[in-house]
Amino acid sequence: MKLCGFDVGLDRPFFLIAGPCVIESEQLQMDVAGRLKETTAALGIPFIFKSSFDKANRSSGTSFRGPGREKGLEILAKIRRELNVPVLTDVHTEDDITEAAKVVDVLQTPAFLCRQTDFIRAVAQSGKPVNIKKGQFLAPHDMKNVIDKARAAAREKGLPEDSFMACERGASFGYNNLVSDMRGLAIMRETGAPVVFDATHSVQLPGGQGTSSGGQREMVPVLARAAVAVGVAGLFMETHPDPCNALSDGPNAVPLKHMKALLETLVALDSVTKRNGFLENDFGA
């Protein structure tokens, strides 16, 4: 798959989707995007900046949702233009899809909406690459149906069918908890789409703080290393310079000051994993 000018797949180094969970201010986004661009360039990691203009699924109705679509897209457009980095944002409605597709390079669908057929069809027909998140309630093999829906919708419009990624972000495990079954990353390869691992939402404790979600950010490196050892096309990680005071998903965000060290480890591990190949492909023979 070709994504934002670079090739992605299990025969290529992983690419990174990263940035703050939500757009808090223009300056914060510019600072984080600039820092991430510098770090990833030094490590040879293809990079896509992400942030949300509207967090439409916050735990509480009083939680900060973002600057809104118009202002948020203006900020993302500025980052794209001035820093020359591709940008990704998530969409929640068909109106979001139409407007965001005019600005960003990649669209992302929320995990909660992966079974909404009309929504998946609409985003697939946007003409943009799409990172489709697996629902916390969905078995890994069921993502094939989701990807197939997207491909069929793209095909109807004469659009490329290889524009979709399948993203793992953990599975519900009782109340207020998620687990990551690493077998799922291998199973999701059966979709034929590049597999992305969301290492930060996978350590979220949904609704675990009453009116907001908790998280275990110290477990992000653990799961990220595991995913890279399994073999993935890309990684998704939210990061913030001050996670304890972030306006959304701070408990599971990577402190920006630690991103370089974490990525250095992951690059080394990714190289070993992909150099030696995937023996599991031969075990059924």
Curated annotation (Swiss-Prot):
Superkingdom of this protein's organism: Bacteria
Catalysis: reaction(s): D-arabinose 5-phosphate + phosphoenolpyruvate + H2O = 3-deoxy-alpha-D-manno-2-octulosonate-8-phosphate + phosphate
Pathway listed: Carbohydrate biosynthesis; 3-deoxy-D-manno-octulosonate biosynthesis; 3-deoxy-D-manno-octulosonate from D-ribulose 5-phosphate: step 2/3; Bacterial outer membrane biogenesis; lipopolysaccharide biosynthesis
EC numbers, comma separated: 2.5.1.55
Subcellular location field: Cytoplasm
Coiled coil (residue ranges): none
Cellular component terms per the entry's GO annotation: cytoplasm
A biological process from GO: keto-3-deoxy-D-manno-octulosonic acid biosynthetic process
Keywords, in A-Z order: Cytoplasm, Lipopolysaccharide biosynthesis, Transferase
Pfam families: DAHP_synth_1
HAMAP family: KDO8P_synth (MF_00056)
Annotated family: Belongs to the KdsA family.
Protein name: 2-dehydro-3-deoxyphosphooctonate aldolase
Organism: Paracidovorax citrulli (strain AAC00-1)
Gene transcribed to yield this protein: kdsA
